[in-house]
Amino acid sequence: MFSKNKISVGFAGLAKNVGKTTALISVLDNLRSLGKRIALTSIGYDGEEIDNITGLPKPKYFLKVGDLVATAQRCLVSGLRVVQETDVFTPLGRVLIARLERDTRVILAGPNKLRDLEKALTMFFSEGAEVALVDGSINRVYPLKLVDRFILSTGIARTGNLNRLKLEVEALNFFASLPVAEPSGNALEFIPSNIAPYKGQDLIFKEGVNFLLSEDLIGTYLKLKRHLLNGGKLGVINPLKISAITVSTFYPKPAKEGFEPAFMDIDLERELSFSKIPVIDVKRGRDGRRLAKIVLGSGG
């Protein structure tokens, strides 16, 4: 999207508590150890200290001197110096580009529209950032079509059924491998609820990221796979590009009072090794460094 030496990376999770923020923080820390100049923003607000459903602590973003952040005016904390102002507004005020003058925790409330995100990224790179990280979500996934790399997170908090998790990863590989199609006036925004009338026809979809909005990834996958078996063809004008899938064995376990943190004793990397998209558990060994190399386009 931008120049060769400027990389934008989006992160989203298929559910809450699947390690999206942990993956982003791991990438951030490893990129910093490689000497990269970093910028960070969020599609929407990300600043709660406690998960409003489970009551468990949420990972926090701590940035260092020289890092850049795009956040709303009311989220600015001491130690941030505004270097550029955008024309993007949120309920928490204008989105500002700021540079850290001391190490501090940051609260993010960034642009949530594609054009507004593009403005923030352009400003980041004009201020010298080499890698811009974007904390996104499945509910607001469309702006992430803008980024150069897309990291998708899933895990036991999404489903404790290993067979279902495998099928979902299989579905993600399927969606990401659909052939690129030429622009067409008949391109579909979303998958029809009833695909039978299209039997034997070519189905062209406009945006690959929209597959992730399906309430039933497996059902959608099986429906499209059946369409191929019935002689139809599939294509995507703007394909779904997933650079890596991060996985987490963490899940919030119901307790007497709310929830408590728990982990399933399973090697998800091994269980999902069939995936052509790299599957990474950033909590395991050196896999955080491996994910950072994928972000930079130098590993897999």
Please give the residue ranges for each predicted region.
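Short hydrophobic/aromatic beta-strand immediately N-terminal to the Walker A/P-loop
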Residues: 8-15
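Hydrophobic positions on the alpha1 helix immediately C-terminal to the Walker A/P-loop
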Residues: 23
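General beta-strand structural signal in soluble alpha/beta enzymes
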Residues: 38-43, 109-110, 131-136, 152, ...
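Conserved catalytic-core segment of NTP-binding enzymes
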Residues: 113, 117-274
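A cross-taxonomic marker for long C-terminal extensions/tails that follow the last structured domain
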Residues: 243, 274-300
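Conserved glycine(s) of the Walker
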Residues: 18-19
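Pre-Walker A adenine-sensing motif
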Residues: 1-3
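N-terminal phosphate/diphosphate-binding loop that engages ATP/GTP or pyrophosphate donors
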Residues: 27-99, 299
